[in-house]
């Protein structure tokens, strides 16, 4: 009986607190800031997955960050849809070549993210390092347009570019 009284009192307290906030429809500045930080973290994970996928030759991980109808402009080609993008990574991307065992890295200070609601842009560089020599063997830049689709941030459009190896 005592547990039931405590439970009822706790429920009443929650209702009172929620009513004092104006209900769940009210979004506070703290809520907005927290959501923004969560979105920025999730967007940053796209770069992490991108580089993990190239280092490990994990095509499924790579494709998990692309939207179904994504467009990728790379090497004077326009690839449309996950099938064409997947094919390019498997057949033309040097980091995915079976004979290359490169580590893929990005200088964190070169990552640029602009967030606007459920859309964002992100730029990062890919520095491919031969672990045997410690030398950068290839570098590229990429600008992604991202969208939050069904609660998940995905690449909808991307364009490859040359990277600047200086700060």
Specify the residue positions occupied by each region the protein language model found.
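Positively charged n-region of N-terminal signal peptides that target proteins for export
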Residues: 1-4
């Amino acid at each position: 009986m005592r547990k039931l009284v405590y439970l009822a009192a706790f429920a009443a307290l929650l209702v009172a607190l929620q009513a004092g906030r104006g209900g769940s429809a009210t979004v506070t500045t703290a809520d907005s800031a927290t959501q923004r930080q969560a979105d920025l973290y999730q967007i940053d994970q796209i770069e992490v997955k991108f580089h993990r996928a190239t280092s490990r030759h994990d095509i499924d991980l790579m494709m998990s960050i692309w939207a179904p109808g994504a467009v990728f402009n790379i090497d004077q080609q326009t690839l449309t849809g996950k099938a064409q993008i997947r094919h390019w990574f498997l057949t033309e991307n040097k980091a995915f070549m079976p004979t290359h065992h490169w580590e893929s890295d990005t200088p964190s200070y070169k990552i640029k993210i602009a967030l606007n609601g459920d859309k964002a842009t992100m730029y990062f560089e890919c520095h491919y390092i031969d672990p045997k020599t410690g030398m950068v063997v290839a570098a590229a830049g990429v600008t992604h347009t991202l969208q939050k689709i069904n609660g998940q941030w995905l690449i909808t459009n991307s364009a490859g570019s040359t990277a600047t190896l200086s700060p």
